[in-house]
Amino acid sequence: VGFKAGVKEYKLTYYTPEYETKDTDILAAFRVTPQPGVPPEEAGAAVAAESSTGTWTTVWTDGLTSLDRYKGRCYHIEPVPGETDQYICYVAYPLDLFEEGSVTNMFTSIVGNVFGFKALRALRLEDLRIPTAYIKTFQGPPHGIQVERDKLNKYGRPLLGCTIKPKLGLSAKNYGRAVYECLRGGLDFTKDDENVNSQPFMRWRDRFLFCAEALYKAQAETGEIKGHYLNATAGTCEEMMKRAVFARELGVPIIMHDYLTGGFTANTSLAHYCRDNGLLLHIHRAMHAVIDRQKNHGIHFRVLAKALRMSGGDHIHSGTVVGKLEGERDITLGFVDLLRDDFIEKDRSRGIYFTQDWVSLPGVIPVASGGIHVWHMPALTEIFGDDSVLQFGGGTLGHPWGNAPGAVANRVALEACVQARNEGRDLAAEGNAIIREASKWSPELAAACEVWKEIKFEFKAVDTLD
């Protein structure tokens, strides 16, 4: 039988509204903005085709395979409320299209090519449903929430962190000194900034040594286990692994990686190393806003968060709801739950398009960081709950008396909020009063309250629900 050459409409092959999705399919929800004159069915089918088996014309080699078995299918389309030309197109991909245990391959297939497609004005991947059969091919986070608590011996409260500033320009010795003061004052963690790798003013090995010295000294003085996120991100995977190995030899509890700039392949390798060697892995999302900030084009952060849980990381930055960085409350809590919980029900009011079962993949601790200070502590404790890291960079180091008093102020504020919550008080309503009461017993907290009493970062969130 000859084949019929020529171009035919995508929707004839790839738009299948009668299709019943399988438990093993990867499901995607795309926000599609077609070019004027392109019907939504054709646009949705084009997305399904270009991200699976299709190309722009019929090819004779189609006859050598079973398209029905391997093609992506656009199985449902709904208009976006309040928009005239946007649609949510649901696409189902057969599992055989993807390499096991490879986030890299999953993204190359689903978002690799189709975003430059001419028939679309814009395209955004809003959510993915990863089937359990595929999840079981991933190791996921090196340790997860419970193992981390056991390693640190810290229970019943959020953990406190601080990014060392100025992020660039300090010598290794002064950097270590700043780390020591923060940890000595009562923080659980300090953090390398995401762009601290190994620059001329501070090479990585020197930084690792001085930070290790700082955290052992703080540990001995406070009797608490301390950590510093040593950034192992590097220009090559081999160099990254070398840094991770050195961190393990120093006996530190945690290292760090920039997973988007470093790449999923590097990140997954590092996560495997961390599990095999007992290191916790802190993940920074540098570059995420390039991908996720536009409402009608790109990839929503909840998808990047799911991908990170599969690739592997014990902490990930996830917005604050109250600080200087983007994040609306319901949406942020939607992907915070995606990171922590075993099972998440579909809930469109929180931007969750699919029910997701993580089976036995460990959870990831969300990190709230960016423009937060002691007055935010009640809100953060209430919004994020115990399984979170609250990270105050300027909110620690900007204290008028220095780093250690800044750390004391944050720890006192946190302990006051946790105690008030445990006594049944309403943190949302009484937050300011709780902080004021605590500041009577802590001059460090009183000074912090005074400095930041007027600060607000009030802008309308870009990332809103429809």
Curated annotation (Swiss-Prot):
State whether it acts alone or in a complex, and with which partners, per the record. Answer: Heterohexadecamer of 8 large chains and 8 small chains; disulfide-linked. The disulfide link is formed within the large subunit homodimers.
Q: How is it modified after translation?
A: The disulfide bond which can form in the large chain dimeric partners within the hexadecamer appears to be associated with oxidative stress and protein turnover.
Source organism of this protein record: Proboscidea louisianica
- Protein known as: Ribulose bisphosphate carboxylase large chain
Remarks, anything else? The basic functional RuBisCO is composed of a large chain homodimer in a 'head-to-tail' conformation. In form I RuBisCO this homodimer is arranged in a barrel-like tetramer with the small subunits forming a tetrameric 'cap' on each end of the 'barrel'.
Its biological purpose is as follows: RuBisCO catalyzes two reactions: the carboxylation of D-ribulose 1,5-bisphosphate, the primary event in carbon dioxide fixation, as well as the oxidative fragmentation of the pentose substrate in the photorespiration process. Both reactions occur simultaneously and in competition at the same active site.
Q: Which residues carry this modification: N6-carboxylysine?
A: 191
- Name its co-factor(s): Mg(2+)
Q: Where in the cell is it found?
A: Plastid, Chloroplast
Q: What is its EC number?
A: 4.1.1.39
Q: Which UniProt keywords apply?
A: Calvin cycle, Carbon dioxide fixation, Chloroplast, Disulfide bond, Lyase, Magnesium, Metal-binding, Methylation, Monooxygenase, Oxidoreductase, Photorespiration, Photosynthesis, Plastid
Q: Mind telling me which HAMAP family this protein's record contains?
A: RuBisCO_L_type1
Which residues are substrate-binding? 113, 163, 167, 285, 317, 369
Which reactions are catalysed by this chain?
2 (2R)-3-phosphoglycerate + 2 H(+) = D-ribulose 1,5-bisphosphate + CO2 + H2O; D-ribulose 1,5-bisphosphate + O2 = 2-phosphoglycolate + (2R)-3-phosphoglycerate + 2 H(+)
In this UniProt entry, the residues modified to N6,N6,N6-trimethyllysine are 4
Q: How is the cofactor bound?
A: Binds 1 Mg(2+) ion per subunit.
Native organism taxonomy: Eukaryota, Viridiplantae, Streptophyta, Embryophyta, Tracheophyta
PROSITE patterns membership: RUBISCO_LARGE
UniProt GO cellular component terms = chloroplast
